[in-house]
Regions:
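A residue-level signal for conserved active-site and pocket-lining positions in enzyme catalytic cores
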Residues: 60
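Charged interaction scaffolds used for protein-protein
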Residues: 1-12, 17, 36-54, 65-104
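Short capping micro-motif at the N-terminus of alpha-helices
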Residues: 20-22
């Protein structure tokens, strides 16, 4: 069970639900993968709709790793993500919102 107030999101990979969370380490890895200069640049890509499928993949991988998953981006390329590309993009957007919004 995920805790939205802790920034957690569920992503189901190959039928198995995983807890995702953008930890500081996961964010740093994601910045490097996405070639972002800063967290603001990274968030701006999603806010303006100028993100690629690579960006979504990097965000989902970072969230999965932050939640304790030990897989790789290569593993995720071959996996079935519940909801497909749309489900992955929604999970990525939700991860960003929950990571950078104060709990209400």
């Amino acid at each position: 069970m995920v805790n939205p107030l802790a920034g957690e999101v569920t992503v189901t990979v190959d039928g198995v639900p995983h807890c995702c969370k953008l930890t500081l380490g996961a964010l740093a890895e994601m910045e490097a993968t996405m070639g972002a200069e800063s967290l603001v640049d990274l968030v701006a890509r999603f806010e303006t709709g100028k993100f690629s499928s690579r960006d979504v993949m990097a965000l989902v991988v970072a969230g999965l790793r932050g939640g304790g998953w030990d897989g790789s981006a290569a593993d995720l390329l071959r996996a079935d993500i519940e909801g497909g590309a749309v489900g992955a993009a929604q999970a990525a957007a939700t991860l960003l919102v929950r990571a950078f919004s104060p709990p209400s």
